[in-house]
Curated annotation (Swiss-Prot):
Activates KDO (a required 8-carbon sugar) for incorporation into bacterial lipopolysaccharide in Gram-negative bacteria. GO terms for biological process: CMP-keto-3-deoxy-D-manno-octulosonic acid biosynthetic process; lipopolysaccharide biosynthetic process. Gene3D superfamilies: Spore Coat Polysaccharide Biosynthesis Protein SpsA, Chain A. It catalyses: 3-deoxy-alpha-D-manno-oct-2-ulosonate + CTP = CMP-3-deoxy-beta-D-manno-octulosonate + diphosphate. Its main location: cytoplasm. The keyword Nucleotidyltransferase applies. Belongs to the KdsB family. The keyword Hydrolase does not apply. Pathway: Nucleotide-sugar biosynthesis; CMP-3-deoxy-D-manno-octulosonate biosynthesis; CMP-3-deoxy-D-manno-octulosonate from 3-deoxy-D-manno-octulosonate and CTP: step 1/1; Bacterial outer membrane biogenesis; lipopolysaccharide biosynthesis. Keywords: Cytoplasm, Lipopolysaccharide biosynthesis, Nucleotidyltransferase, Transferase. This is 3-deoxy-manno-octulosonate cytidylyltransferase. It is found in: Cytoplasm. One of its GO terms (cellular component) is cytosol. It comes from Histophilus somni (strain 129Pt).
Amino acid sequence: MNFTVIIPARYASSRLPGKPLADIAGKPMIQHVWEKAQQSGATRVVVATDYEEVARAVRGFDGEVCMTSSQHNSGTERLAEVIEKLAIPDDEIIVNIQGDEPLVPPVIVSQVAQNLQKYQVNMATLAVKIEDVEELFNPNVVKVLTDKDGYVLYFSRAVIPWDRDQFVQLGKADLSQLQLHQHYFRHIGIYAYRAGFIKQYVQWQPTTLEQIERLEQLRVLWNGERIHVELAKQAPAVGVDTVEDLEKVRSILSHV
């Protein structure tokens, strides 16, 4: 199947400035992400950036780059600009991989594209089971709840569903004894959409729920569209948000 991967690579980061160019095993981080996307079988891989040094690095390893505005409020807005500039057809499948995911498994890149095509929805994504109590209660871990067919009911930074009886019985002091049931899933921030849907998405105004949760995918649910979720065939390792994350990834790739 044909699909295009777009990798937003924003240079300015409050926690780790310049991270697309951070050296990992002798290559800039963005090159690792690009290589994983290439290995997925994508028809085309484009890096979208607002910083010339990142663009120069991408050209240096023969990657395709699209310069974008630095004024975007979200990665989805950056995707929409790329689609317009490159005249990508409305029915083209677009997979969005974040530029700070140098360990993303290529198999899940193709999986999310196939998920979109299989279920004939405008947007698809992936999740993995939560098996750790600390992860469950971590607001930086986005939880996703679906119906019986895998269509999203809600995304939240809070614990969903809330196991009332078990939580009340254990109390905060005994959460280590919590029995995690099969309905707890961590959302993986990789998406597939039709190009035309991305153009539609950016026409919608930000919604109350997405502003409260700081999760832009809630705009899709608010406007009555469906998102399908599959369990990822392979759980991705850590992304790079902090210096500590960067050191973990460097350690992993130094042994590859």
